[in-house]
Regions:
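Terminal low-complexity/charged segments
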Residues: 1-250, 411-425, 491, 500-533
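Metal/cofactor-centered catalytic core regions of large enzymes
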Residues: 63, 193-570
Length: 570
């Protein structure tokens, strides 16, 4: 019998995490911990803690065994955690408990073949210069998330092939997500007062011409042509800089510079109350605001253990599937513009259909893009009478429109030649890169979180998951087109089975009481006052919860310390 490591006891006070003695893991009654049992048997005292936490399999691993652990988790026949979906880090310096290490790295592993998820936490021993081995040579998809954790949290990943900042500019003076960096802690380099002396010569000065040697990203060949595309370029559909290496007309390499639109959502979220971050989640991707709301509130509701009324569940599914269609329509229009298959015509057509969806959104909440409609405990308001009538008309018209788009594009020789055989990714490549959503399904991986790890009531719906095997741009196009049809199928079932009842929970500690109740109930007034002043108190614990968004897996990792604000929000 193995004995637990003495160091395990340093982690006994982590919020919500119960330390499990190694022999006890095997005796857990549910088969969901069979994976943690096998891991503990393999690594013994190097597993600091293991078991279920908020329903999720969680293990704590010593950093010196992390590489070996990751390779074992990926290749072992009984585990087969072939994908890494997320990497982040936690700065625990402001937690009021325990004497453990300041920094921890957090990994989310996924087994598509076994429909299992595993959260891996690695405490880092050096508080001043935290470092941990990079997993990029095991999971290709770790490269960018590790760069982000280094950039924003200051954790160095030894052995990383290209460890540099990814969001903040090089030379930024701090790592913003560390707890000792305040919100707005950076110095603003410009004055806002035109009378200040620094503006006296504005527009009149001539700077001396100086020769600046070009700085190339790692791996670029100076013998080829290097072109800067963006950050302001119509083909990037946003503020994005691409350093493109060309050999003649062939693109050899692209190095993306992503940070121009970095808005600090995580730092902001850690300084906002749980209920207030719903409005920020819209802005993470305004083309998928409903889905952003949905993923966030599901995570918090699972931490709270709150039950959602059946009517609210069905309304959420209707709205998020409408949002999926709207997002796919916008993708289709911009994709056609870039490929120039039929010029601007398809963009105008899909905009017409997308406007009908936005009209439906406006009917329920008054907003079209940043809707903030899905709230903690339910939805903002019930469906108005005219909503279902207009939705029924849309459900009749939309399948015909999708067929029209396919005829316009699929029968176009130009469309075919510019998509078929282009951007081919094999099944193994998309899994190891950590790609999700239509990218994953376009390369032959039959996986959809709505079906394979159902949430929010999706287990009650009958729909197909479209999969293609070619792995090229055309395959991903066909997957998204069929996904719109399947979303219509889900919405039709939801409308048919829409129950009566409340549209939000009656737990007054989670959702505000209705206005009429405030006039007659002092208790309702007290609940309203406490929710608006103190906020919603989430019990200590942590959770990673993911949904199938329009662009792929959208996961939220929340570390709660018992207050009204998330200690860590990722």
């Amino acid at each position: 019998m193995l004995n637990p490591s003495p160091r395990v006891r340093e982690y006994e006070n982590i919020p919500g995490v119960v330390r499990l003695d190694i022999p006890a893991v095997a005796s857990l009654p549910t088969g969901e911990t069979a994976d943690t049992t096998r891991i503990v048997e393999r690594f013994g005292e190097d597993i600091l803690a293991a078991g279920l936490h908020n329903g999720a399999q969680t293990v704590y691993v010593k950093p010196e065994r992390l590489l070996e652990f990751a390779e074992f988790a990926r290749t072992d026949e009984k585990l087969r955690y072939e994908a890494l979906t997320d990497v982040t880090a936690i700065d625990r310096s402001e937690l009021p408990i325990g004497n453990g290490e300041r920094f921890q790295t957090v990994y989310q592993l996924r087994s598509y073949s076994r429909k299992q998820h595993l959260t891996v936490i690695c405490p880092l021993p050096n508080d001043d210069e935290p470092a941990v081995p990079s997993l990029a040579n095991i999971y290709k998809g770790a490269e960018w998330p590790e760069r982000e954790a280094y950039d924003l949290m200051g954790v160095r990943f030894t052995g990383h092939p290209d460890l540099r900042r990814i969001m903040m500019p090089e030379g930024w003076p701090n790592h913003p997500l560390q707890k000792n960096v305040p919100v707005g802690g950076e110095e603003v380099p410009f004055s806002m007062t035109w009378s200040d002396p620094e503006f006296a010569s504005l527009g009149t000065q001539i700077l001396p011409a100086t020769s600046v040697p070009p700085t190339l990203p790692p791996g670029m060949n100076r013998e080829n042509m290097i072109i800067n595309m963006g950050p302001h370029h119509p083909s990037t559909h946003g503020v994005l800089r691409l350093v493109v290496e060309l050999d003649g007309e062939t693109v050899v390499k692209i190095d993306p510079d992503l940070g121009y639109l970095h808005s600090g959502f995580e730092k902001t979220g850690e300084n906002k109350r749980y209920k207030d971050f719903v409005y920020y989640s819209d802005r993470m991707d305004y083309l998928s605001a409903m889905l952003n709301n949905f993923g966030y509130v599901l995570t918090i509701e699972k931490l709270l253990g709150v039950d959602i009324p059946p009517r609210a569940q069905v309304i959420r599914i209707i709205m998020t599937e409408l949002q999926r269609i709207a997002s796919h329509l916008f993708w289709l229009g911009t994709h056609v513009m870039d490929v120039s298959g039929t010029g601007m015509s398809v963009m105008m057509y899909v905009t017409r259909e997308r406007e009908r969806i936005l009209d439906l959104f406006e009917m329920v909440c008054g907003a079209r893009l940043t809707v903030s409609y899905i709230r903690l405990g339910g939805v903002y308001r019930d469906l108005p009478d005219a909503f279902l009538t207009n939705l029924a008309d849309f459900l009749v018209a939309m399948p015909v429109r999708i067929d029209e788009y396919e005829r316009m594009l699929t029968e176009s020789p130009l469309w075919d030649v510019r998509l078929q055989g282009i951007g081919v990714l094999s099944r193994d490549e998309v899994i190891n890169m950590g790609l999700t959503g239509p990218m994953l399904r376009g390369s032959g991986v039959d996986w959809d979180l709505r079906r394979d790890m159902p949430y929010g009531g999706f287990e009650n719906y009958d729909f197909k998951v479209p999969v293609a095997t070619e792995g090229d741009c055309f395959a991903r196009y066909t997957v998204r087109m069929e996904e719109m049809r399947q979303s219509l199928r889900i919405i039709s079932q939801a409308v048919k089975n829409l129950p009566d009842g409340p549209f939000k929970t009656e737990d007054r500690k989670v959702a505000l009481p209705p206005r009429a109740e405030l006039d007659v109930s002092m208790e309702a007034l007290i609940h309203h006052f406490k929710l608006m002043t103190e906020g919603l108190l989430v019990p200590p614990g942590m959770l990673y919860h993911a949904i199938e968004s329009s662009k792929g897996e959208l996961g939220y990792f929340v570390y709660a310390d018992g207050s009204a604000k998330p200690y860590r929000l990722h």
